[in-house]
Amino acid sequence: MLFDTHVHLDDARYNDDRDAVIARARESGVEAFVTIGCDLATSGAAVEIAERYPFVYASIGVHPHEVKHIQDDWYNEFRCLAKNKNVVAYGEIGLDYHYNHSAPKEQRERFREQIQLAREIKLPMIIHTREAQEDTVSILREEKASDVGGVFHCFSGDAWLAKQALDLGFYLSFSGILTFHNSTPLREIAKATPLDRTLIETDCPYLTPVPYRGKRNEPSYVSRVAQQLASIHGPTLSFEQIGVQTTENAKRLFRIS
């Protein structure tokens, strides 16, 4: 029993074998996944994919890279998409100062707007933050993001950010980065994170875990993240226990019965 909380199944790299990718995930024990929107078009695509498969859910929103493209009618379009029963989250949203594909000031403004929208439509948020920890936390606090909660996806921050996220009532989601050779500090944070606040993801097709580095990532590989978590916790927690608990956590966050 596994729940991949962050996939990009609309990505063109799956166009030739999307059904086979999803079938492999199911065969490997992945019970469900959330496919993520990064702008209006990909949010619509996420909803379409979720309608096609009963075990796939969708998240809608605008990634910080893409906020410079937001048009006046987008938020109303998101309000309409949010009415679909398969939409379980708003995101991925946040701040990314590494690439600055959108100007930092505009990122912050749009982040606030999107938190406000998530609160209005009562959806938990999927947060992306890179080299913007303090601003991300400050804005989440100021905009009362805890009212709906959410998850820091693909967590790769430090212990300070982990504590701030947990204090806000958010979950931490760990990806294939956890398996990388140079991720010892992150593994320590994962070990210290309460299991009932832990999620797992692939962020596929990105961030392929060891031992599949160099290949396209896919949801079936989320088992490698669960295995790494079990290894981190040692004999006290089995792979099966990790799978059961993180799946329960995902269903609780996304209000999936």
For the regions a language model picked out, list residue spans one by one.
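Mid-domain alpha/beta scaffold segments of enzyme catalytic cores
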Residues: 1-257
